[in-house]
Amino acid sequence: GPCPEGSGVADRATCATFTVPKDYDDPSSGTIELTMSKIPASGQKKGVVAGNPGGPGGDALGMFSDPSDKGEGSQAVHLPESVGKNYDLIAVEPRGLTWGTPLNCEPEIATPYMTAGMLYGACESHNPGYTKTVNTENTARDLEEARKLLGEKQLNLYGLSYGGPLMSTYATLFPEHTNKAIFDSSASPNDLVFRLAEKRQAIRHEAIHEFFSWV
């Protein structure tokens, strides 16, 4: 069907909403909704390319331009026209984002600042148990659910930036359903986001102390 308004998809793209387990380790936890976009192959279809633009948490629905537009679209990834002739291009919106069951982290009481613990508590207050499931492994498992829905035996993977570790996680979990993989400007799986944030926080802390000692 049609894609959500404002999702930035290519003109020929269509979208579908589907449900997945909220917590794959706990079937009793219920389900969440996700949205997937697809640009169908313009010629004889040979398979499917599944993409993720990185982030983590980057909006994925509109990541692919339509290869038949010869790179004229405003989307982030422009693949060769030959790819668009032979492959459907799909992207699953990562769990927790707008075009699905969103992770609502608005605090009940407005505050000028929030610690990580306060933010986590706000997220949990709206959908208990959901926050901990928004991770790389579950996002990869969500892609596997999309593959099943499409009825495809294998997926070709395209991961940009953090999408590289995400797609490599999928390939590790589901090697029998992985064909070819491209990791474009891939982030290192050793430099996890929180570790990077900790490094940046330490640098900021040092810089602030140097500034005030100078003042």
Predicted regions located by residue number:
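Gly/Pro-rich cap/lid or specificity-loop segments adjacent to the active site
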Residues: 1-215
